[in-house]
Amino acid sequence: MKKKALAFAAMACSVAMLLSACGGSNSNAASGDTAGSNIITAYNSEPQNPLIPGNTNETGGGKPVDLLFSRLVSFDKDGKASNEVAESITPNDDATQYTIKIKSGWKFTDGTPVTAESFTKAWSYVANAKNAQKCSSFFSAIAGYDDLQKDGLKGDEQLSGLKVVDDTTFTVDLNQSDSVFPIKVGYSAFAPLPESFYKDPKAFGEKPVSNGPYKLAPLGSQQGSRPRQEP
């Protein structure tokens, strides 16, 4: 999968997508620029917070987060959901437990694989009250959520309703039946996170390591950055 570059103009309060054309060349490109690349201004609002999926609930940050991070399911222009990172999302008879299998081969932009634990740790981090994430309540239906709202937490406690079976499989136990849970996991708060996130969440939010179709390419103060396309 090729990743296009997403560039953020920090001082100009704008977000630009660096879209690389497939094939051909740009005859007007300046010396040293990447051929076949263009800068298109897409979202003229600045993120209010660092770009962490579970702590983003506004348009300025939500748009780039949607481009940077792929979730278990995605939605087409008509709002129809289909599996993206997920291979399958299978409920038990009363939809109180789901077995989720993810596709192998997905990687973050730092080269590390997207695994089942990439989801379970990320979801638990967002749910944990110690971490004060804006989207915490989205995980209230998962067993163990109430335990992560108590005082005295360290921040690394995990949701008891999430169990890793193997690198590509995990289960989700819910507090009650929820037949639309497979749709909810398409929201950006349910994105996976790499291990590097937990070392310094604040620094991560300024330069996210993501798994979506775009990667972050910060613009310089004058000339900007060159569009990059990763294999």
List PLM regions with ranges.
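Bacterial Sec-dependent N-terminal signal peptides
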Residues: 1-7
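C-terminal motif of bacterial Sec signal peptides marking the signal peptidase cleavage site
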Residues: 19-21
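Bacterial signal peptide processing site
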Residues: 23-25
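Short, well-ordered beta-strand elements
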Residues: 35-49, 87, 97-100, 119-122, ...
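N-terminal lobe/hinge region of extracytoplasmic solute-binding protein
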Residues: 43-93, 209
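Aromatic- and charge-enriched surface segment that lines or borders ligand/interaction sites
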Residues: 87-138
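Surface-exposed binding/hinge segments that line
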Residues: 118, 134-194, 220
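Gly/Pro-rich hinge or "lid" segments in bacterial periplasmic/extracellular proteins
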Residues: 174-231
